Amino acid sequence: MKVLIQDDDSGLYLSHQERWTEDPKQARDFAFSIHAASVARKLGLRKFQIYFFFNEIDYKISVFKSGQSEAA
């Protein structure tokens, strides 16, 4: 399982070296949702979601949406 950041405006996932990708399989794994939320805020993202992504079955679950309660 990977922990991903997705920009709500573009629909892209944060990859390595602050690049963005359409493919969640190529996105950076933040390991913990609280770390992902911290990184998203440091980057100044206003509208973002954090997902748990299961690469083996190509499935994702939204666990945090900016503007709502703290990350899981």
Feature map (PLM): residue ranges:
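Short aromatic-glycine-(Arg/Gly/Cys) micro-motifs in beta-strand/loop hairpins
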Residues: M1-D23
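Residues in well-ordered beta-strands of folded domains
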Residues: Q6, A31, Y51
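Intrinsic disorder/low-complexity signal
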Residues: Q6-D8, R28, I57, S69
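Intrinsic low-complexity, intrinsically disordered segments enriched in polar/basic residues
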Residues: L14, A27-R28, F52
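A short, charged, amphipathic alpha-helix used as a generic interaction element across diverse proteins
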Residues: W20-F48
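Short, mixed-charge low-complexity intrinsically disordered segments
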Residues: A37-A72
